[in-house]
Regions:
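Terminal amphipathic helices with adjacent charged low-complexity linkers/tails
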Residues: 39-46, 227-244, 299-300, 305
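Surface-exposed amphipathic alpha-helical tracts and adjacent flexible/coil segments at the periphery
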Residues: 210, 221, 232-237, 312
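Acidic-aromatic/histidine active-site loop/patch
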Residues: 218
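A conserved regulatory-domain signal marking ACT and ACT-like small-molecule sensing domains
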Residues: 238-402
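Short phosphate-binding/catalytic loops that engage adenosine nucleotides
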Residues: 33, 89, 223, 286, ...
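Short hydrophobic alpha-helical runs that function as membrane-insertion/retention elements
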Residues: 167-171, 225-227, 289, 370
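Nucleotide/pyrophosphate-binding catalytic subdomain
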Residues: 1-215, 306, 382-383
């Protein structure tokens, strides 16, 4: 059996935790399994690298940031291989170059294109545990790239797919996927299982346990996925195509405080305007989420949308540079907002779900600024100061603690 295991930064934050991870991996190895381990940088090391970089340059080039970031994961995998060796088990650490993890050239948000698994297979054939850097790749120029937030999750599922792994396990500082972030909602309950589609929406909308791109890939390649704690032996949560128990009306509530709203005011009310606006952003690799179009002054319209706060400067810059092409009058950015979402496949066959969510927010005096929906989710834009309170109110309204 071939198992791919991914451990986040908190799981390898210090010597004790590194050895804890090493021992867990060795348990599976000694059962005769082939084991591939994907690691993030230790603890808050990536944040420390960002601070160091900005002490030198307030707006460092993205290519150089990628060069810097790769240090963190390389440190983690080398120390892990050393720990396993000290416990009497052969292990080898490999980085993106050695694995030939090819990506696009979008520094800071590259996408995986191809993985050459030959080197990993050779090491597994020699009965070694293979420890691979997450989060990083190489582009066609042989420059380092990074995969953006949640990149180590994406690395792990891509390796699982390339190696035709029998199982993919992701270890975090929580015991699985919960109905809400247990650090913000004390009544949150761990789910035994959840569908790919539900997990994808929760990941996209702010649930930090998994990254949306990794869930997309897991679904695409049918990779079995288990989310569990690195600190104990609890069963965790299974993410798969269909759940075996009766579908819940709502599977979870997510809160995203990393969004900002951009309002483009005074657009001409004519064909092609929306295309020009969002094409301009797409060419800068800026993802747009919630979109609202409203009637403006005579003969004009306004469009508001949300982007990740890390993309705000790039978004405002490219829109200002293309004002004459797009044809708007004013541009505004609003910070201190939050996206609150409910997700659940059960809402497809149950009317009144959105109304129940809106009622719970009304009862708590929370104002809704924007609304977006799909078959299995409802998202509202609210003030950030109301976020955690509103999240708990909605969680209670749908009895998710039961």
């Amino acid at each position: 059996m071939l198992i791919v295991k991914k451990f986040g930064g908190t799981s390898v934050a210090n010597k004790e935790r590194i050895f804890n991870v090493a021992k867990r991996c060795i348990e599976d190895y000694k059962k005769g399994n082939d084991v591939v381990v994907v690691l993030s940088a230790m603890g808050k090391y990536t944040d420390e690298l960002i601070t160091m970089a900005r002490d030198i340059n307030e707006k460092p080039p993205k290519r150089e940031m990628d060069m810097l970031f790769t240090i963190g994961e390389q440190m983690s995998v080398a120390l892990m291989a050393m720990a396993m060796d000290s416990l009497g088990v052969p292990a080898v650490s490999l980085n993106a170059f050695q694995v030939a993890m090819h990506t696009t050239s979008a520094h800071g948000s590259a996408r995986l294109k191809k993985i050459d698994a030959a080197r990993i297979r050779r090491e597994l054939d020699n009965r070694r545990i293979v420890v691979v850097t997450g989060f990083q790749g190489i582009d066609k120029y042989n420059d380092y790239t990074t995969l953006g937030r949640g990149g180590s999750d994406t690395t792990a599922v891509a390796l699982a797919a390339a190696l035709h792994a029998d199982a993919w396990e992701i270890y975090t500082d929580v015991e699985g996927v919960y109905t809400a972030d247990p650090r913000k909602v004390p009544k949150a309950r761990k789910l035994k299982e959840i569908t790919y589609d539900e997990m994808l929406d929760l990941a996209t909308l702010g649930a930090g346990v998994l990254h949306n791109r990794s869930v997309e890939m897991a679904k695409k390649y049918g990779v079995p996925l288990v989310v569990r704690s690195s600190l104990n032996n609890s069963e965790g949560t299974v993410v798969k195509e269909e759940v075996t128990v009766e579908r819940m009306l709502i599977s979870g509530v997510a809160l995203d405080t990393d969004a900002v709203r951009i309002a483009v005011i005074g657009l001409k009310d004519s064909p092609g305007v929306a295309f020009k606006l969002f094409d301009t952003l797409a060419k800068k690799n800026i993802n747009v989420d919630m979109i609202l179009q409203s009637i403006g002054r005579a003969g004009t319209k306004d469009i508001s949308f949300t982007v990740d706060k890390n993309d705000l400067d790039d978004a405002m810059g490219v829109l200002e540079a293309n004002q004459s092409r797009i044809g708007y009058v004013e541009l505004h950015a609003e910070k201190n907002i939050a996206k609150l979402s409910i997700v659940g496949a059960g809402m497809m066959s149950n009317p009144g779900v959105a109304a129940k969510m809106f009622e719970s927010l009304y009862n708590e005096g929370v104002n809704i600024n924007m609304i977006a929906t799909s078959e299995i989710r409802v998202t509202v834009l609210i003030n950030e100061k109301d976020g955690v309170h509103a999240m708990n109110a909605v969680h209670d309204a749908f009895n998710l603690a039961d």
